[in-house]
């Protein structure tokens, strides 16, 4: 019987997601056993700086990917939104399970909705994508950076000077928080999600045929098609989770993939948004990126990167 070694970050959410995947794979094929190996990533080590200032891609996956290439682990469970658009040679996304809730969740002290927050309210987030879209909706808000896991952020909301914080609905759901804790689920029209938000990525070596066969049984085709379109868009835009870029795809009534992409200035003053539909995920992502680049999206990303590097 083969023991499959699974790499995971040490956070409660990461371990919970990894255990969920292992349970599902064990149900599909009980002849395998699994062993979790916890790995600390660069993104986990740097908690006193915003992610946008840390820079680079793969802040939460690079060390885990290296362990896979070294054969210390066989596979890894990641949050898809942490995955860079391009993978290291030799590694593949072996499986994309069914997606969780894609929305961002607003949690406020008095259970107020976004439009009900007082003028100048302090909102905590670690994401330029979220802050840019919030500022477009409510330019009067004060954005204050916040890092740490879900429990830490909820504690900071209670004890520090935040009026509200924004978290991914998927993370709250996976950690067993009830929907009652959420003041408002922000619609994709208000706050377009990050590429891959709510989805998991199970990564492994491309030559591990046995494992790839097991993982193929756990892939959700709807999620796979839509997420691949989003990731193709991200790749063409040369984006990362450190810049204000968003992408969300669904299947429309004609059974086509419908992808909306968004790039914003950090202050939310400039937002470029485009929707493209079709049947081929790669082609749709590429087309959406091209249409947005023609409207100045890449120049906007370059400006954000330049501004961040000079701070």
From Swiss-Prot:
PROSITE patterns: PORPHOBILINOGEN_DEAM. InterPro entries: HemC, Porphobilin_deaminase_cofac_BS, Porphobilin_deaminase_N, Porphobilinogen_deaminase_C, Porphobilinogen_deaminase_C_sf. It is an enzyme of class 2 (transferase). Pathway: Porphyrin-containing compound metabolism; protoporphyrin-IX biosynthesis; coproporphyrinogen-III from 5-aminolevulinate: step 2/4. Coiled coil: none annotated. GO terms for molecular function: hydroxymethylbilane synthase activity. The keyword Protein biosynthesis does not apply. Binds 1 dipyrromethane group covalently. The modification S-(dipyrrolylmethanemethyl)cysteine is found at residue 241. It comes from the Bacteria. GO terms for cellular component: cytoplasm. Its EC number is 2.5.1.61. Keywords: Porphyrin biosynthesis, Transferase. The keyword Transferase applies. Its cofactor is dipyrromethane. It catalyses: 4 porphobilinogen + H2O = hydroxymethylbilane + 4 NH4(+). CDD domains: PBP2_EcHMBS_like. GO terms for biological process: protoporphyrinogen IX biosynthetic process. NCBIfam families: hemC. The porphobilinogen subunits are added to the dipyrromethane group. Tetrapolymerization of the monopyrrole PBG into the hydroxymethylbilane pre-uroporphyrinogen in several discrete steps. Belongs to the HMBS family. Monomer. This is Porphobilinogen deaminase. The gene is hemC.
């Amino acid at each position: 019987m083969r023991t499959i070694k699974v790499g995971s970050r040490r956070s409660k959410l990461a371990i919970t997601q990894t255990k969920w995947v292992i349970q599902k794979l064990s149900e599909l094929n009980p002849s395998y056993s699994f062993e979790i190996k916890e790995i600390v990533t660069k993104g986990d080590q740097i908690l006193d700086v915003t992610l946008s200032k840390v820079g680079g891609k793969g802040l939460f996956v690079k060390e885990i990917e290296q362990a896979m290439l070294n054969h210390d682990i066989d596979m890894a469970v990641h949050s898809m939104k942490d995955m860079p658009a391009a993978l290291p040679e030799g590694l593949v996304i072996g499986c994309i399970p069914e997606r969780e809730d894609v929305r961002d969740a607003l949690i406020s002290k008095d259970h107020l909705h976004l439009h009900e927050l007082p003028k100048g309210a302090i909102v905590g987030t670690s994401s330029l994508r979220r802050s840019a879209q919030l500022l477009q909706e409510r330019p009067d808000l004060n954005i204050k950076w916040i890092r740490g896991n879900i429990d830490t952020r909820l504690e900071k909301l209670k004890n520090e000077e935040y009026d509200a914080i924004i978290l991914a609905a998927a993370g709250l759901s996976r950690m067993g928080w009830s929907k009652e804790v959420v003041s408002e689920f922000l619609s994709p029209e208000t706050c377009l999600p990050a590429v891959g938000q709510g989805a998991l990525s199970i990564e492994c070596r491309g030559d591990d045929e046995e494992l790839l066969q097991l993982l193929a049984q756990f892939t959700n085709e709807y999620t796979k098609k839509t997420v691949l379109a989003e990731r193709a868009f991200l790749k063409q835009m040369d984006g990362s989770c450190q810049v204000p870029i968003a992408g969300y795809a669904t299947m429309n009534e004609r059974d086509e993939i419908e992808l909306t992409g968004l790039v914003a200035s950090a202050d939310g003053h400039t937002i470029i948004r485009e929707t493209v539909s079709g049947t081929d995920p790669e082609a749709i992502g590429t087309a959406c990126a091209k249409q947005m680049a023609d409207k100045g999206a890449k120049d906007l990303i370059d400006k954000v990167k330049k501004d961040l590097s000079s701070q």
